[in-house]
Amino acid sequence: MILKQKFFNRPALKVTEDLLGKFLVRKIGNKEVALMITEVEAYDGFQDKASHAHRGKTKRNEVMFSEAGRFYIYLIYGFHNMLNIVTGKKNYPAAILIRGAGDISGPGRLTKFLKIGRHFNNKKANRKSGLWIEDRGIKISKRNIKRTPRIGVNYAGKIWAKKPYRFFLKQKKLNFQFPICKLLSSFVFSVIIY
């Protein structure tokens, strides 16, 4: 089931945790590639000094102020696209960075593998855009979720750099059954192409 706007129209930290175990799906040509989301980071509002929105709205971050369920894509180091999904109420700037999915760790590697560029910026997460997130019925136990500070945000100062807003799965080899999908490997973290 494709996640609708209602799923994302909630507080960022709640959505962040709930995204673990969901599937990021990208349509490339006539194929769909699906990867289970394994690592995410929350950026929550004006007060979050690690957030692009901390100093207010700019042309670069304006999508963070829009409706939930839109993608926020930006470039770092001149060549890595970062994939975020906007959460919460309109005009409250919050977004979630998708750092890992499937066997891919690292947000730059993920967007490169899925051919996600800045043309997805401000697009809705749905089939029409060619990029969306699905719930395939996997329930992740809280015992299998670890929270740590976000990566590379020391510029935010001691308090915000230490906020435990990064969520990831502790155990990478989980056994699930998918009656509808064919897995190319015994583990859910592998790529599904159908």
Predicted regions: what they are:
Residues 1-176:
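Conserved, well-structured core segments that form or line functional sites
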Residues 138, 173-194:
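Short, basic, low-complexity termini and linkers enriched in Ser/Thr/Gly/Pro
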